Amino acid sequence: MISGLLKKIFGSRNDRLIKQYSQNVKRINALEPAMQALSDEQLRAKTDEFRQRHANGESLDDLLPEAFAVVREAGQRALGMRHFDVQMIGGMVLHDGKIAEMRTGEGKTLVGTLPAYLNAISGKGVHVITVNDYLATRDSDWMGRLHRFLGLTVGVNLSQMDHEAKQAAYAADITYGTNNEFGFDYLRDNMVYTAGERVQRSLNFAIVDEVDSILIDEARTPLIISGQAEDHTDLYLRMKDVVPNLTRAMEEKDEGDYWVDEKGHQVHLSETGYEHAEQLLAEYGLLKEGTSLYDAANITLMHHLNAALRGMTLFHKDQHYVVQNGEVVIVDEFTGRLMAGRRWSDGLHQAVEAKEGVQIQAENQTLASITFQNYFRMYNKLAGMTGTADTEAYEFHQIYGLETVVIPTHRPMVRKDMNDLVYKTADEKHAAIIADIKDCAKRGQPVLVGTTSIEASELLSGLLDKESLPHQVLNAKQHAREAEIVVQAGRPGMVTIATNMAGRGTDIVLGGNIEKQLAAIRDDESLPVEEREQKAAAMKAEWQEVHNAVLASGGLHIIGSERHESRRIDNQLRGRAGRQGDAGSSRFYLSLDDPLLRIFAGERLRAIMDKLKMPEGEAIEHPLVTRSLESAQRKVEARNFDIRKQLLEYDDVSNDQRKVIYQQRNELLETDDISETITAMRQSVIAETFRTYVPAESVEEQWDMEGLERALASDLQIIAPVAQWFKDEPTLSDEEILERITKNADEAYQAKIDLVGDGTFHQFERNVMLQSLDSHWREHLAALDHLRQGIHLRGYAQKNPKQEYKREAFELFEGLLDLVRREVTRVVFTVQIRTPEDVEETAPHAEVQNVQYQHAGYDEALGEGEGAEAAGQQPADAGPKIGRNDPCPCGSGKKYKHCHGKLS
């Protein structure tokens, strides 16, 4: 009550903002006569003048009044369209990084030209984002005329464009494109192997058209790039034959080709083992004569040999996995349950498949993924336009930090929004809709019928056919054709049935749109100029008559065939009528069979109808019914908001990690010499290995010098006679020993550089680092995905799933960084680089096939929800408890206590 009183005295925040912006509009209007007096060349020269002034320290805010006045005049000259005062306010709202809610028909597309021009002056690029390729192309051509008139460059970013065309589009001052394409380009740019392959510049300023659709409706579905890893089936099969020919040593000191470290779950080849393996691989035609497993070109062979050895010696059938229906299925080592659908990484699963003689499946990996929330929050400044944002203002503020400002209409709104009519059955509702359409058609009033599904639109179309009523059906599939039809939906007596989103972004002009016909007359050079003007004038006069007739019939009539889950979508449908002060009306027809009513209010309304003994075909019409429906919609909207917020909270964890990995990649691509990074990695890995065998602040009796020497040689290929040093000089401190090992490693590293020269070796290091980062990041994405799918079950253990996810994801990430450090150090020391050609062999290349771009379903991408209502439920996979003497569920035939029971 008090807040309402204060609002009356001081006005709402929205009113105060509009008042402030209106002061600026007065300044812009005062500049209009001066702009009108300029020639085209002088007007165009203003762009360079603004750039110079901005470079000299003037802010974009200082330039705003003059720049907006220039755009208004250019709009008049290039497009024949003058920006209204309310459109100027909309432009300022967008420039301030807010959301402008403007009614349908108020010229949002034209409003976007104002902040786009002003922000393009900085030279950092502006992205104008729309919902489909058709609108991106249309707006870049249409509004591009204004920008090009003022000397700016305009690009359009479409799917299926080649690399050069994309780079050119992003290099332009203003780039139009779709949300999906901008997001995928960002992901692709973080998968390239040279800086020159990237297409995007820094993310400076984005203007999102239909911002509610992009930032809210599509925010539940992440963008995913996935693909099949390179097919090495043949290699796995041949490696399977190589491994049995190698002999196993029981202990590390014993003779043999390899020994198995069961504690560390690794297999290590001895020096004789490497030689024997090289000989066998040469016999099988896998290794070229005169080459070594240590050569740069043979890193893949080394990887496959290691996978085959591990698969053969460390993973046993009916203990670690079972073979079922021709597939290798992992057995959970703690529960003994089968883990269908899970696969080991690093080629291990394929090695086991080769061992068991089943079909080897190519790994389908997620290569990169991001949500729209996290992509758009990376822009330095974000703004949006829509006809309906006020209902979601809270979400825009919570998730994106964006304020919503409702822009006043240019002319007062006179559309008549009638109360909903609720019928008992769907058949009664459909009969009432047909009767309403018939009545409108008789009076020559155009009708737009909005449906929530293609099925519903086809049903109504069939009923209209039975009544022999001419009509057109639009389902959101062919955007370009739809736009043409929607434009003409305002002709007298025209009946159009459309799904809610069909033809969005295109205005319905009462009397039809004659712009195309007028353009054809103006461009017809076979006619004299005078005759062209006469023809155009006659066409306009004819259109005015039709326009007036439609207004007299009541303007466009909107019929909603059912309420949508979101009030915003209903408001969008209503907003198709009553544009720019035109007459119009809207009415929703509902039945108790509609999903929303059935779930939230059906029983109560049905009871009322039964009590009133309402005859068939009669409807309930009352503001109370409309209000209760809006309350039901609010509940659904709140639930959907919670789902999106939850997705974001989970994705924020991987987003922080994504930023770290992508930043490292970018530094690698932009730095010529990464030897400092490699040195820091090497020293960190050596120190960690050293402290494993020589703990800090420990006595000499606890030091394992022989173990340290072996670990340095086998894990890092660093040869340091540590045991001998200590024997010769017993007084050596642990710090001195570490210093010597580091010095030895530094000398060995420098010797490798001296062999081929700085440039060649540093390029090799970069290649190794990129490959390692990319492959481990892909595996990490899969691990996070698996973690997220099962994390909700932690709720049953009275743990917070979100906190658990954050903690475990952090541990996984630390493990990833450690793996990369160790792998890069080992490969740099192991691989022998003799010529620049060897470096070419190590160059990373896209090891994936059948790359797919998905805007995947939320449930598919997220797995199950967090399971907040955990108390009264059972875990999805909870089976009966296994007794110690029961057969083990892995299928081995042993008792549980002698099989997987040992592990738990």
From Swiss-Prot:
Sites where the protein binds Zn(2+): 888, 890, 899-900
Cofactor descriptive note: May bind 1 zinc ion per subunit.
Keyword terms of this UniProt record: ATP-binding, Cell inner membrane, Cell membrane, Cytoplasm, Membrane, Metal-binding, Nucleotide-binding, Protein transport, Translocase, Translocation, Transport, Zinc
Cofactor: Zn(2+)
Biased composition (Low complexity): 868-880
Binding of ATP, residues: 87, 105-109, 507
Broad class of enzyme this protein falls into: translocase
Domain of life: Bacteria
Chain segments annotated as transmembrane: none
Stretches the record annotates as Disordered: 865-887
GO biological process: intracellular protein transmembrane transport; protein import; protein targeting; protein transport by the Sec complex
Entry's Gene Ontology molecular function annotations: ATP binding; metal ion binding; protein-exporting ATPase activity
Reactions accelerated catalytically: ATP + H2O + cellular proteinSide 1 = ADP + phosphate + cellular proteinSide 2
Subcellular location: Cell inner membrane; Cytoplasm
GO cellular component, one term: cell envelope Sec protein transport complex
Membrane topology value: Peripheral membrane protein
The keyword Membrane is annotated on this UniProt entry: yes
Chief place of localization: membrane
PROSITE patterns xrefs: SECA (PS01312), SECA_MOTOR_DEAD (PS51196)
Any Pfam family the entry gives: SEC-C
HAMAP family per UniProt: SecA
Summary of subunit composition and partner proteins: Monomer and homodimer. Part of the essential Sec protein translocation apparatus which comprises SecA, SecYEG and auxiliary proteins SecDF-YajC and YidC.
Role this protein plays: Part of the Sec protein translocase complex. Interacts with the SecYEG preprotein conducting channel. Has a central role in coupling the hydrolysis of ATP to the transfer of proteins into and across the cell membrane, serving both as a receptor for the preprotein-SecB complex and as an ATP-driven molecular motor driving the stepwise translocation of polypeptide chains across the membrane.
Family to which the UniProt record says this protein belongs: Belongs to the SecA family.
Name of the featured protein: Protein translocase subunit SecA
Species the sequence originates in: Dechloromonas aromatica (strain RCB)
